[in-house]
């Protein structure tokens, strides 16, 4: 508990612990859930792959957020990469969604666009087919650095 308190103080945010799905090699939450706003998060389509694990995640998230949205796709058996839309790259100016040239691309774009209203007309899709083959998404392959306005940059 001391570690959680220290993390909360350091980051100035509530720390939420999700269980590690032992079927996943890395266990990173950027492949499971994304922050939408103070009241809501978006979960990937975990329920279409592992309903029991999705329920565990959902129950934990519902104790911290008023709304837990979930991606879902019409395909009876979603493509094996469809979980990775949640692993988008987000900047202050644009949200970059991965695409995999599969039927779920458009569905993911529409669902995420409806939730990420602050990015209206500023959501782009980039082919991440090669990247996902190596078990990573756009967020995995990036590094977030906050630069304060007017700060000298290297």
Regions inferred by a protein language model and the residue ranges of each:
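Histidine/cysteine-enriched polar flanking segments
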Residues: 1-154
């Amino acid at each position: 508990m001391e570690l959680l308190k220290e993390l909360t103080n350091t980051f100035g945010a509530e720390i939420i612990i999700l269980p590690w799905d032992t079927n996943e090699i890395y266990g990173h939450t950027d492949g499971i859930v994304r922050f939408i706003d103070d009241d809501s998060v978006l979960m990937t389509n975990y329920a279409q792959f592992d309903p029991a694990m999705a329920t565990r995640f959902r129950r934990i998230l519902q104790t911290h957020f008023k709304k837990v949205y979930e991606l879902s796709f019409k395909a009876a058996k979603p493509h094996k990469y469809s979980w990775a839309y949640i692993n988008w790259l987000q900047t202050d100016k644009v949200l970059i969604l991965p695409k995999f040239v599969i039927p779920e691309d458009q569905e993911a774009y529409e669902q995420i666009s409806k939730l990420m209203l602050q990015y209206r007309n500023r959501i782009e899709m980039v082919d991440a087919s090669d990247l996902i083959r190596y078990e990573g998404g756009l967020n995995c392959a990036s590094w977030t650095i906050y630069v304060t306005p007017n700060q000298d940059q290297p």
